[in-house]
């Protein structure tokens, strides 16, 4: 009897294994399912239209402007944190920190958020341009200050033209600068000359783009006295 039980158990195991094997044979690779979650706009178009109208009315009125800094990805967004459309509607300006590298989806979202009176600014960080030059110059001792001015001018022009190329609503100039107190005379003159060249190109751009927004972000006390009057050209 004991032996019969063993044989019966062995037969049962074989049958179960055979069923599992045959079911595995019929398995198919999983397929992704596109699930669409309707947006507020799709669920209630009229209510959304009323909301947009009231939002624009608020932003057209007198209020404290809200700026946010945004590290936009070089490729198309893969999650909500990389999307312009996910930023709060109360924001007025989004400053893109990677203005030279815009994906097609990010460009499309720049257009989409304008319906909420959210505008995008191309961020030009002068210190980054200086650092580019310093990295270039440290490997070549023969480069001169004239070469530095030429390089900085070319990079500045290349950054300014992005506003037209990508359809930004304006430019934010990020200029930290340095304290001029205690600077040696030759260093001071170089500092002033580079500053003057940079801002003169920005103001030339401004003359040709009166319909765009120009914002200065930095320390006013680090501007040379002869460059102070250019602040009137900013929004």
Which residues fall in each region the model found?
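Chitinase-like catalytic core of GlcNAc-active glycosidases
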Residues: 62-235
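Bacterial Sec-dependent N-terminal signal peptides
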Residues: 1-7, 15-58
């Amino acid at each position: 009897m004991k032996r019969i039980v063993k044989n019966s158990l062995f037969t049962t195991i074989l049958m179960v294994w055979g069923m599992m094997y045959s079911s595995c044979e019929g398995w198919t690779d999983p397929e992704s399912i596109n699930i669409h979650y309707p947006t507020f706009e799709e669920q209630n178009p009229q209510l959304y239209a009323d909301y947009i109208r009231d939002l624009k009315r608020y932003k057209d009125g007198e209020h404290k402007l809200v700026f946010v800094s945004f590290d936009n990805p070089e490729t198309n967004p893969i999650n909500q944190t990389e999307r312009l459309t996910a930023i709060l509607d109360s924001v007025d300006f989004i400053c893109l920190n990677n203005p030279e590298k815009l994906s097609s989806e990010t460009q499309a979202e720049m257009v989409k958020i304008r319906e909420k009176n959210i505008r995008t600014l191309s961020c030009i960080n002068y210190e980054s341009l200086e650092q580019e030059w310093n990295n270039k110059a440290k490997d070549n001792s023969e480069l001169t200050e004239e070469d530095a001015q030429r390089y900085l001018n070319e990079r500045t022009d290349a950054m300014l033209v992005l506003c037209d190329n990508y359809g930004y609503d304006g430019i934010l100039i990020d200029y930290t600068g340095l304290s001029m107190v205690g600077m040696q005379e030759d260093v001071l003159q170089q500092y002033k000359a580079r500053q003057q060249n940079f801002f003169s190109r920005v103001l030339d751009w401004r003359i040709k783009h009166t319909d765009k927004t120009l914002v200065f972000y930095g320390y006013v006390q680090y501007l040379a006295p002869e460059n102070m009057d250019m602040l009137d050209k900013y929004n």
